[in-house]
Regions:
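Pepsin/retropepsin-fold aspartyl endopeptidases
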Residues: 1-145
């Protein structure tokens, strides 16, 4: 697998470490507006999301949205949107990033029931697609270009 790293480095990919939790989720650190948080890396989530309780923590400016969110066993959830944020995973950056904000309490309650760490949000397919992501499950790295 070291060859994979060398090939991707030549293609200007950035390597970001993740951990596998007790619940088999991929846990990754990210910074939003310079503030570090814990996130689930979720290929099945269409958008990167933050919980309502983290609006102040990440210094987000939130606006109401007509879009309803669904996922992880919940549907029809109210959402807000936060535009023009700075997102960083390892050394990969996006300086004009939009986030969906919604109630993540059902996610964190499920994690707590397994004695797993609560998360601030979910890194979704929007980031993975933009970064042309390659996930190395064996070595626990996501590569972003």
């Amino acid at each position: 697998m070291e060859d994979l790293h060398k090939v991707l480095k030549k293609e200007k990919y950035r390597k970001v470490k993740f951990k596998i939790t007790k619940t088999q989720h991929l846990l990754i650190k990210a910074k939003i507006n310079g503030v570090s948080g814990n996130f689930i890396l979720d290929t099945g989530a269409s958008n990167t999301c933050i919980g309502f309780e983290s609006i102040g923590y990440f210094e987000l400016s939130a606006k109401k949205s007509k879009t309803k969110a669904s996922g992880a066993g919940a549907t029809g959830m109210e959402t807000q949107i936060s535009s023009h944020n700075h997102l960083q995973l390892g050394s990969w950056k996006n300086t004009d990033f939009n986030l969906v904000i919604f109630d993540l309490s059902h996610v964190n309650e499920a994690l707590k029931s397994y004695k797993a760490k609560a998360v601030h949000g979910i890194i979704g397919a929007d980031v993975l697609l933009e970064g042309k992501a390659i996930i190395d499950y064996y070595n626990h790295y996501v590569y972003l270009q």
